[in-house]
């Protein structure tokens, strides 16, 4: 099932999702480094990465929602897409709450702030797996004419426009 939100022939959601996943996961890593080294600069940097991750997650959600709405009803893909989407709303909420708790003092986050981010990271592993299931097993966002020798997507877009 082809994506309904594409740029230059590729699904926008798949292009954007690397930003929140990378930024949010790295903010967790920086929490761990800060705890191991007692270096508050890692906590502060993680705080800013977390904020950018939340914002980029909201941006990635828009084309994801567009693609979700195009999935046929009463399919396994629709059910998994729903759990994936709701789960990612929860992930974003957990990280946003952690970010808010850190806002006044990003160099020394509370245990609650670290716990919320850790919970968000754990949930993101599951929702990321669901996203992989949608694409890799169920073909959501995959071009209908995809095959091992398919022409590049830019060439295909020019052929369609002609």
Language-model features and meaning:
Residues 1-162:
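Short amphipathic, positively biased membrane-proximal segments
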């Amino acid at each position: 099932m082809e994506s309904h939100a594409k740029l230059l022939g590729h699904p926008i959601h798949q292009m954007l999702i690397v930003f929140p996943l990378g930024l949010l996961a790295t903010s967790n890593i920086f929490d761990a480094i800060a705890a191991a080294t007692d270096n508050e600069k890692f906590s502060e940097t993680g705080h800013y990465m977390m904020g950018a991750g939340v914002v980029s997650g909201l941006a990635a959600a828009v084309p994801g929602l567009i693609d979700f709405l195009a999935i046929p009803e009463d399919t396994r893909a629709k059910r998994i897409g729903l759990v994936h989407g709701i789960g990612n709303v929860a992930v974003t909420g957990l990280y946003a709450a952690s970010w808010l708790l850190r806002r006044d003092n990003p160099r020394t986050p509370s245990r609650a702030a670290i716990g919320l981010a850790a919970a968000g990271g754990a949930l993101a592993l599951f929702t990321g797996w669901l996203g992989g299931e949608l694409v890799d097993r169920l073909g959501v966002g995959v071009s209908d004419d995809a095959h091992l020798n398919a022409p590049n997507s830019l060439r295909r877009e020019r052929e369609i426009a002609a």
